[in-house]
Protein backbone atom coordinates (compact mmCIF):
# COMPACT_ATOMS: atom_id res chain seq x y z
CA UNK A 1 0.00 0.00 0.00
CA UNK A 2 1.65 3.24 -1.14
CA UNK A 3 1.98 6.33 1.04
CA UNK A 4 3.98 7.44 4.02
CA UNK A 5 4.92 5.00 6.72
CA UNK A 6 2.42 4.72 9.53
CA UNK A 7 3.14 4.94 13.26
CA UNK A 8 1.05 2.38 15.14
CA UNK A 9 1.05 1.74 18.88
CA UNK A 10 -0.21 -1.46 20.46
CA UNK A 11 -1.05 -0.99 24.14
CA UNK A 12 -1.19 -4.19 26.17
CA UNK A 13 -2.01 -4.03 29.88
CA UNK A 14 0.11 -6.40 31.97
CA UNK A 15 -1.72 -9.12 33.95
CA UNK A 16 -4.75 -6.86 33.72
CA UNK A 17 -7.23 -8.49 36.12
CA UNK A 18 -4.60 -9.09 38.78
CA UNK A 19 -3.18 -5.58 38.31
CA UNK A 20 -6.64 -4.04 38.74
CA UNK A 21 -7.09 -5.97 41.99
CA UNK A 22 -3.75 -4.64 43.23
CA UNK A 23 -4.74 -1.10 42.26
CA UNK A 24 -7.91 -1.42 44.36
CA UNK A 25 -6.14 -3.12 47.28
CA UNK A 26 -2.56 -1.87 47.80
CA UNK A 27 -1.97 -4.66 50.35
CA UNK A 28 -1.84 -7.09 47.41
CA UNK A 29 1.07 -5.36 45.69
CA UNK A 30 4.22 -7.40 45.42
CA UNK A 31 2.39 -10.60 46.37
CA UNK A 32 1.50 -13.64 44.26
CA UNK A 33 -2.09 -13.00 43.18
CA UNK A 34 -4.36 -14.98 40.86
CA UNK A 35 -7.88 -14.39 39.61
CA UNK A 36 -9.76 -17.67 39.17
CA UNK A 37 -13.16 -18.56 37.79
CA UNK A 38 -14.25 -20.57 40.82
CA UNK A 39 -12.20 -19.76 43.89
CA UNK A 40 -14.15 -21.98 46.31
CA UNK A 41 -13.63 -25.12 44.25
CA UNK A 42 -10.16 -26.55 43.85
CA UNK A 43 -10.97 -27.36 40.24
CA UNK A 44 -11.40 -23.67 39.40
CA UNK A 45 -9.11 -22.34 36.66
CA UNK A 46 -6.61 -19.47 36.92
CA UNK A 47 -7.76 -16.70 34.54
CA UNK A 48 -4.72 -14.50 35.10
CA UNK A 49 -2.00 -14.04 37.68
CA UNK A 50 0.54 -11.48 38.81
CA UNK A 51 4.17 -11.64 37.77
CA UNK A 52 5.07 -12.58 41.34
CA UNK A 53 2.84 -15.65 40.95
CA UNK A 54 4.31 -16.44 37.53
CA UNK A 55 7.80 -16.38 39.02
CA UNK A 56 6.66 -19.19 41.31
CA UNK A 57 5.40 -21.34 38.46
CA UNK A 58 1.73 -20.30 38.32
CA UNK A 59 0.32 -20.07 34.80
CA UNK A 60 -2.90 -18.98 33.15
CA UNK A 61 -5.44 -21.84 32.65
CA UNK A 62 -3.78 -23.83 35.45
CA UNK A 63 -6.21 -25.46 37.92
CA UNK A 64 -6.26 -23.71 41.30
CA UNK A 65 -5.12 -26.86 43.12
CA UNK A 66 -2.07 -27.09 40.89
CA UNK A 67 -1.33 -23.38 41.24
CA UNK A 68 -1.49 -23.74 45.04
CA UNK A 69 0.94 -26.63 44.84
CA UNK A 70 3.43 -24.43 42.97
CA UNK A 71 2.77 -21.46 45.23
CA UNK A 72 1.17 -22.28 48.62
CA UNK A 73 1.00 -18.58 49.55
CA UNK A 74 -0.96 -17.73 46.37
CA UNK A 75 -3.82 -15.28 46.98
CA UNK A 76 -6.74 -16.41 44.82
CA UNK A 77 -9.52 -13.90 44.10
CA UNK A 78 -12.85 -14.20 42.27
CA UNK A 79 -13.30 -12.05 39.14
CA UNK A 80 -14.87 -8.60 39.53
CA UNK A 81 -15.95 -7.65 36.03
CA UNK A 82 -17.50 -4.30 36.95
CA UNK A 83 -14.16 -3.29 38.39
CA UNK A 84 -12.30 -4.46 35.27
CA UNK A 85 -14.69 -2.67 32.92
CA UNK A 86 -14.29 0.58 34.86
CA UNK A 87 -10.51 0.34 34.65
CA UNK A 88 -10.74 -0.51 30.95
CA UNK A 89 -12.88 2.55 30.25
CA UNK A 90 -10.43 4.75 32.12
CA UNK A 91 -7.53 3.26 30.16
CA UNK A 92 -9.15 3.91 26.77
CA UNK A 93 -10.13 7.43 27.85
CA UNK A 94 -6.44 8.22 28.34
CA UNK A 95 -5.51 6.70 24.96
CA UNK A 96 -8.14 8.79 23.16
CA UNK A 97 -6.53 11.98 24.46
CA UNK A 98 -3.69 11.35 22.00
CA UNK A 99 -5.60 10.29 18.87
CA UNK A 100 -9.15 9.64 17.70
CA UNK A 101 -7.91 6.51 15.93
CA UNK A 102 -8.05 4.08 18.85
CA UNK A 103 -9.20 0.51 18.16
CA UNK A 104 -10.04 -1.56 21.23
CA UNK A 105 -9.21 -5.22 20.68
CA UNK A 106 -10.27 -6.54 24.06
CA UNK A 107 -10.86 -5.27 27.57
CA UNK A 108 -7.12 -4.76 28.14
CA UNK A 109 -5.51 -3.99 24.79
CA UNK A 110 -5.90 -1.72 21.79
CA UNK A 111 -4.22 -0.08 18.81
CA UNK A 112 -3.51 3.62 18.27
CA UNK A 113 -2.70 5.25 14.92
CA UNK A 114 -0.36 8.13 15.74
CA UNK A 115 0.60 8.91 12.12
CA UNK A 116 -1.22 12.20 11.61
CA UNK A 117 -1.00 13.51 15.15
CA UNK A 118 1.26 16.16 16.70
CA UNK A 119 3.01 13.29 18.49
CA UNK A 120 4.22 11.52 15.34
CA UNK A 121 7.67 13.13 15.46
CA UNK A 122 8.27 11.94 19.05
CA UNK A 123 6.68 8.53 19.13
CA UNK A 124 8.99 7.01 21.75
CA UNK A 125 8.59 9.93 24.15
CA UNK A 126 4.81 9.79 23.71
CA UNK A 127 4.73 6.06 24.40
CA UNK A 128 6.72 6.65 27.60
CA UNK A 129 4.26 9.36 28.60
CA UNK A 130 1.24 7.12 28.00
CA UNK A 131 2.81 4.26 29.92
CA UNK A 132 3.69 6.59 32.79
CA UNK A 133 0.16 8.02 32.95
CA UNK A 134 -1.44 4.57 32.99
CA UNK A 135 0.87 3.63 35.85
CA UNK A 136 0.44 6.83 37.88
CA UNK A 137 -3.23 7.62 37.27
CA UNK A 138 -4.64 4.09 37.17
CA UNK A 139 -1.86 2.18 38.97
CA UNK A 140 -1.79 -0.21 36.01
CA UNK A 141 1.37 -1.44 34.24
CA UNK A 142 1.45 -1.78 30.46
CA UNK A 143 3.68 -2.71 27.56
CA UNK A 144 3.69 -0.77 24.30
CA UNK A 145 4.78 -1.82 20.83
CA UNK A 146 5.60 0.79 18.18
CA UNK A 147 5.70 -0.24 14.52
CA UNK A 148 4.54 0.69 10.98
CA UNK A 149 1.54 -1.70 11.14
CA UNK A 150 -0.75 -3.44 13.61
CA UNK A 151 0.83 -6.88 13.34
CA UNK A 152 4.34 -5.67 14.04
CA UNK A 153 3.11 -3.41 16.86
CA UNK A 154 1.43 -6.40 18.49
CA UNK A 155 4.57 -8.53 18.15
CA UNK A 156 6.63 -5.67 19.59
CA UNK A 157 4.44 -5.19 22.67
CA UNK A 158 4.88 -8.88 23.53
CA UNK A 159 8.68 -8.61 23.59
CA UNK A 160 9.12 -6.78 26.90
CA UNK A 161 6.78 -7.47 29.81
CA UNK A 162 6.01 -5.97 32.21
CA UNK A 163 6.46 -2.23 31.57
CA UNK A 164 8.27 -2.55 28.26
CA UNK A 165 8.37 -0.28 25.22
CA UNK A 166 9.65 -1.82 21.99
CA UNK A 167 10.11 -0.32 18.54
CA UNK A 168 9.98 -2.82 15.67
CA UNK A 169 10.78 -1.61 12.17
CA UNK A 170 10.02 -3.61 9.04
CA UNK A 171 13.71 -3.82 8.14
CA UNK A 172 14.32 -5.54 11.49
CA UNK A 173 11.90 -8.39 10.75
CA UNK A 174 14.55 -10.79 9.32
CA UNK A 175 16.84 -10.35 12.33
CA UNK A 176 14.26 -10.18 15.12
CA UNK A 177 11.19 -12.14 14.03
CA UNK A 178 12.41 -14.74 11.56
CA UNK A 179 14.48 -16.76 14.08
CA UNK A 180 11.46 -17.12 16.42
CA UNK A 181 9.39 -20.33 16.54
CA UNK A 182 6.35 -20.00 14.28
CA UNK A 183 4.10 -20.70 17.27
CA UNK A 184 5.16 -17.38 18.83
CA UNK A 185 3.75 -15.43 15.91
CA UNK A 186 0.54 -13.51 16.55
CA UNK A 187 -2.27 -15.25 14.68
CA UNK A 188 -0.67 -18.70 14.76
CA UNK A 189 -2.32 -20.95 17.32
CA UNK A 190 -1.12 -24.30 18.55
CA UNK A 191 -2.98 -26.32 15.91
CA UNK A 192 -1.90 -24.04 13.06
CA UNK A 193 1.69 -24.31 14.25
CA UNK A 194 1.41 -28.10 14.18
CA UNK A 195 0.04 -28.00 10.64
CA UNK A 196 2.87 -25.72 9.53
CA UNK A 197 5.42 -28.07 11.05
CA UNK A 198 3.95 -30.75 8.80
CA UNK A 199 5.18 -28.63 5.88
CA UNK A 200 8.60 -28.31 7.49
CA UNK A 201 7.87 -24.78 8.72
CA UNK A 202 9.25 -24.32 12.24
CA UNK A 203 10.25 -20.65 12.33
CA UNK A 204 8.66 -17.37 11.27
CA UNK A 205 11.44 -17.04 8.70
CA UNK A 206 10.53 -20.37 7.12
CA UNK A 207 6.90 -19.22 6.96
CA UNK A 208 8.02 -16.00 5.28
CA UNK A 209 9.76 -18.04 2.56
CA UNK A 210 7.11 -20.75 2.21
CA UNK A 211 5.29 -21.57 -1.01
CA UNK A 212 2.04 -19.60 -1.10
CA UNK A 213 0.04 -22.30 -2.90
CA UNK A 214 1.06 -24.91 -0.33
CA UNK A 215 0.00 -22.57 2.47
CA UNK A 216 -3.33 -21.94 0.79
CA UNK A 217 -3.97 -25.66 0.42
CA UNK A 218 -3.12 -26.18 4.07
CA UNK A 219 -4.78 -23.18 5.71
CA UNK A 220 -7.14 -21.73 3.12
CA UNK A 221 -7.16 -17.95 2.66
CA UNK A 222 -5.41 -17.52 5.99
CA UNK A 223 -2.22 -19.11 4.62
CA UNK A 224 -1.13 -16.25 2.32
CA UNK A 225 -2.16 -13.73 4.98
CA UNK A 226 0.15 -15.35 7.51
CA UNK A 227 2.99 -15.36 4.98
CA UNK A 228 2.53 -11.62 4.44
CA UNK A 229 2.61 -10.99 8.17
CA UNK A 230 5.75 -13.11 8.52
CA UNK A 231 7.31 -10.72 6.01
CA UNK A 232 6.17 -7.72 8.05
CA UNK A 233 3.32 -6.85 5.67
CA UNK A 234 -0.07 -5.96 7.17
CA UNK A 235 -2.28 -3.21 5.74
CA UNK A 236 -5.29 -3.38 8.07
CA UNK A 237 -6.16 0.12 9.34
CA UNK A 238 -6.70 1.09 12.94
CA UNK A 239 -10.50 1.20 12.93
CA UNK A 240 -12.34 2.69 15.94
CA UNK A 241 -15.63 1.35 14.54
CA UNK A 242 -14.41 -2.22 14.43
CA UNK A 243 -15.83 -3.00 17.87
CA UNK A 244 -19.32 -2.25 16.57
CA UNK A 245 -18.99 -4.84 13.84
CA UNK A 246 -19.74 -8.49 14.31
CA UNK A 247 -16.37 -10.14 14.75
CA UNK A 248 -18.28 -13.38 15.03
CA UNK A 249 -21.75 -14.84 14.68
CA UNK A 250 -22.86 -17.33 17.28
CA UNK A 251 -25.54 -18.61 19.57
CA UNK A 252 -25.64 -20.64 22.74
CA UNK A 253 -28.43 -22.53 24.45
CA UNK A 254 -28.80 -23.30 28.14
CA UNK A 255 -30.59 -26.58 28.68
CA UNK A 256 -33.52 -26.61 31.09
CA UNK A 257 -31.81 -29.52 32.83
CA UNK A 258 -28.31 -30.99 32.78
CA UNK A 259 -28.18 -33.71 30.15
CA UNK A 260 -25.83 -36.36 28.80
CA UNK A 261 -28.39 -37.73 26.33
CA UNK A 262 -26.68 -37.71 22.93
CA UNK A 263 -29.83 -37.30 20.88
CA UNK A 264 -31.03 -34.41 23.01
CA UNK A 265 -27.67 -32.67 22.76
CA UNK A 266 -27.58 -33.19 18.99
CA UNK A 267 -31.05 -31.65 18.82
CA UNK A 268 -29.64 -28.54 20.51
CA UNK A 269 -26.78 -28.43 18.01
CA UNK A 270 -29.26 -28.68 15.10
CA UNK A 271 -31.12 -25.62 16.35
CA UNK A 272 -27.90 -23.70 16.96
CA UNK A 273 -26.53 -24.55 13.50
CA UNK A 274 -29.78 -23.36 11.89
CA UNK A 275 -29.67 -20.10 13.85
CA UNK A 276 -26.03 -19.38 13.08
CA UNK A 277 -26.56 -20.26 9.41
CA UNK A 278 -29.52 -17.90 9.16
CA UNK A 279 -27.61 -15.02 10.72
CA UNK A 280 -24.56 -15.57 8.50
CA UNK A 281 -26.73 -15.58 5.39
CA UNK A 282 -28.62 -12.46 6.43
CA UNK A 283 -25.31 -10.66 6.87
CA UNK A 284 -24.01 -12.14 3.60
CA UNK A 285 -20.87 -13.45 5.25
CA UNK A 286 -19.31 -16.87 5.68
CA UNK A 287 -17.27 -18.30 8.55
CA UNK A 288 -13.71 -19.51 8.06
CA UNK A 289 -13.41 -20.81 11.62
CA UNK A 290 -15.89 -22.54 13.91
CA UNK A 291 -15.96 -22.71 17.70
CA UNK A 292 -18.11 -24.80 19.97
CA UNK A 293 -18.65 -24.19 23.67
CA UNK A 294 -19.46 -26.92 26.18
CA UNK A 295 -20.42 -25.96 29.72
CA UNK A 296 -20.76 -28.88 32.06
CA UNK A 297 -23.10 -29.25 35.03
CA UNK A 298 -20.27 -28.17 37.36
CA UNK A 299 -19.91 -24.93 35.30
CA UNK A 300 -16.55 -25.97 33.89
CA UNK A 301 -16.49 -24.54 30.39
CA UNK A 302 -14.38 -25.52 27.39
CA UNK A 303 -14.20 -24.08 23.88
CA UNK A 304 -12.79 -25.93 20.91
CA UNK A 305 -12.30 -24.71 17.36
CA UNK A 306 -11.54 -25.83 13.85
CA UNK A 307 -10.15 -23.78 10.96
CA UNK A 308 -12.12 -24.60 7.83
CA UNK A 309 -10.56 -25.31 4.45
CA UNK A 310 -13.38 -23.33 2.83
CA UNK A 311 -15.70 -20.71 4.40
CA UNK A 312 -19.20 -22.01 5.21
CA UNK A 313 -22.66 -20.62 5.89
CA UNK A 314 -24.95 -23.63 5.33
CA UNK A 315 -26.67 -25.26 8.30
CA UNK A 316 -25.57 -28.79 7.41
CA UNK A 317 -21.93 -27.76 7.03
CA UNK A 318 -21.98 -25.95 10.37
CA UNK A 319 -23.71 -28.88 12.07
CA UNK A 320 -21.22 -31.39 10.65
CA UNK A 321 -18.22 -29.45 11.97
CA UNK A 322 -19.85 -28.77 15.35
CA UNK A 323 -20.76 -32.43 15.85
CA UNK A 324 -17.24 -33.52 14.95
CA UNK A 325 -15.73 -31.15 17.52
CA UNK A 326 -18.29 -32.15 20.14
CA UNK A 327 -17.77 -35.90 19.94
CA UNK A 328 -14.02 -35.41 19.84
CA UNK A 329 -13.90 -33.37 23.05
CA UNK A 330 -17.02 -34.20 25.09
CA UNK A 331 -16.12 -36.21 28.21
CA UNK A 332 -19.63 -37.75 28.49
CA UNK A 333 -20.45 -35.77 31.64
CA UNK A 334 -23.82 -33.94 31.89
CA UNK A 335 -23.99 -30.71 29.90
CA UNK A 336 -25.60 -27.44 30.98
CA UNK A 337 -24.97 -25.27 27.89
CA UNK A 338 -23.88 -25.68 24.26
CA UNK A 339 -22.81 -23.02 21.80
CA UNK A 340 -21.67 -22.58 18.21
CA UNK A 341 -19.81 -19.53 16.92
CA UNK A 342 -18.50 -18.78 13.44
CA UNK A 343 -15.50 -16.44 13.28
CA UNK A 344 -12.94 -15.13 10.76
CA UNK A 345 -15.88 -13.89 8.69
CA UNK A 346 -15.47 -13.17 4.98
CA UNK A 347 -17.93 -11.50 2.63
CA UNK A 348 -19.91 -14.05 0.70
CA UNK A 349 -19.08 -12.64 -2.71
CA UNK A 350 -15.37 -12.87 -1.91
CA UNK A 351 -15.56 -16.42 -0.62
CA UNK A 352 -15.29 -19.35 -2.97
CA UNK A 353 -15.65 -23.04 -2.50
CA UNK A 354 -13.05 -25.39 -3.95
CA UNK A 355 -15.34 -28.32 -4.64
CA UNK A 356 -14.23 -31.80 -5.44
CA UNK A 357 -16.50 -33.90 -7.66
CA UNK A 358 -18.32 -35.53 -4.76
CA UNK A 359 -19.12 -32.35 -2.85
CA UNK A 360 -20.11 -30.63 -6.10
CA UNK A 361 -22.67 -33.32 -6.87
CA UNK A 362 -24.02 -33.22 -3.30
CA UNK A 363 -24.25 -29.42 -3.31
CA UNK A 364 -25.84 -29.31 -6.75
CA UNK A 365 -28.42 -31.88 -5.69
CA UNK A 366 -29.28 -30.16 -2.39
CA UNK A 367 -29.07 -26.49 -3.34
CA UNK A 368 -32.52 -26.06 -4.97
CA UNK A 369 -34.17 -27.87 -2.03
CA UNK A 370 -32.20 -25.85 0.51
CA UNK A 371 -33.12 -22.56 -1.19
CA UNK A 372 -36.81 -23.50 -1.40
CA UNK A 373 -36.87 -24.50 2.29
CA UNK A 374 -35.12 -21.30 3.35
CA UNK A 375 -37.52 -19.09 1.37
CA UNK A 376 -40.66 -20.83 2.65
CA UNK A 377 -39.43 -20.89 6.24
CA UNK A 378 -38.56 -17.20 6.15
CA UNK A 379 -41.98 -16.36 4.72
CA UNK A 380 -44.17 -18.62 6.85
CA UNK A 381 -42.04 -19.39 9.92
CA UNK A 382 -38.95 -21.40 10.71
CA UNK A 383 -40.83 -24.57 11.65
CA UNK A 384 -42.94 -24.93 8.50
CA UNK A 385 -40.56 -27.21 6.57
CA UNK A 386 -37.86 -29.36 8.11
CA UNK A 387 -35.84 -32.35 7.10
CA UNK A 388 -36.82 -35.61 8.74
CA UNK A 389 -33.74 -35.75 10.96
CA UNK A 390 -34.65 -32.45 12.57
CA UNK A 391 -38.09 -33.60 13.69
CA UNK A 392 -36.82 -35.91 16.39
CA UNK A 393 -36.93 -34.58 19.96
CA UNK A 394 -38.18 -31.15 18.97
CA UNK A 395 -39.79 -30.33 22.30
CA UNK A 396 -38.51 -26.98 23.52
CA UNK A 397 -36.00 -27.79 26.23
CA UNK A 398 -33.55 -24.95 25.78
CA UNK A 399 -33.21 -21.28 26.44
CA UNK A 400 -31.36 -19.47 23.65
CA UNK A 401 -28.83 -16.72 24.15
CA UNK A 402 -26.48 -14.96 21.75
CA UNK A 403 -22.78 -15.01 22.44
CA UNK A 404 -21.60 -11.51 23.21
CA UNK A 405 -18.61 -10.04 24.86
CA UNK A 406 -19.68 -7.74 27.67
CA UNK A 407 -16.71 -5.52 27.00
CA UNK A 408 -17.65 -4.78 23.39
CA UNK A 409 -21.28 -4.17 24.37
CA UNK A 410 -20.02 -1.83 27.07
CA UNK A 411 -17.73 0.04 24.66
CA UNK A 412 -20.61 0.53 22.25
CA UNK A 413 -22.72 2.18 24.96
CA UNK A 414 -19.96 4.47 26.21
Curated annotation (Swiss-Prot):
Q: List, alphabetically, the Pfam families matched.
A: IMS, IMS_C, IMS_HHH
Q: Which GO terms describe its cellular component?
A: cytoplasm
| CDD domains per record | PolY_Pol_IV_kappa (cd03586)
Q: Which HAMAP family match?
A: DNApol_IV
The EC code for this enzyme is 2.7.7.7
- Provide the protein name: DNA polymerase IV 1
Q: List the disulfide bonds.
A: none
Domain UmuC spans what residues?
A: 8-189
Residues of the active site are 109
Residues annotated to bind Mg(2+): 12, 108
**Keyword field:** Cytoplasm, DNA damage, DNA repair, DNA replication, DNA-binding, DNA-directed DNA polymerase, Magnesium, Metal-binding, Mutator protein, Nucleotidyltransferase, Transferase
The annotated phenotype of a deletion mutant is: No visible phenotype in the absence of DNA damage; in the presence of H(2)O(2) or methyl methanesulfonate (MMS) cells grow poorly on solid medium. A double polY1-rarA deletion is less sensitive to both H(2)O(2) and MMS.
- Stretch list, region Disordered: 391-414
The opening ranks of the lineage are: Bacteria, Bacillati, Bacillota, Bacilli, Bacillales
* A biological-process GO annotation: DNA-templated DNA replication
Q: Which PROSITE patterns match?
A: UMUC
Cofactor comment: Binds 2 magnesium ions per subunit.
Q: Could you tell me which species this protein originates from?
A: Bacillus subtilis (strain 168)
Question: Major place of localization?
Answer: cytoplasm
Q: In the UniProt record, does the keyword DNA-binding occur?
A: yes
Amino acid sequence: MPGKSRIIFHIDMNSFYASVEMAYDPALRGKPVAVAGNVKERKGIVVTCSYEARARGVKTTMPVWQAKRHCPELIVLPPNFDRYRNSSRAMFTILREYTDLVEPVSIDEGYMDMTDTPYSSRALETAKEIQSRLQKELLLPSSIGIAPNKFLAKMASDMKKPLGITILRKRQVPDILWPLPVGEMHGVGKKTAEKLKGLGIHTIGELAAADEHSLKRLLGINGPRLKNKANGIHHAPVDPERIYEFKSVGNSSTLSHDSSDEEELLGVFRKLAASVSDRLQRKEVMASKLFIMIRYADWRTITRSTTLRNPIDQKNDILKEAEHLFFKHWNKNPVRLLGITGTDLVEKEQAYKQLDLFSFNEDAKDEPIQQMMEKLNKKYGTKLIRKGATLKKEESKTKGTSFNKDFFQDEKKS
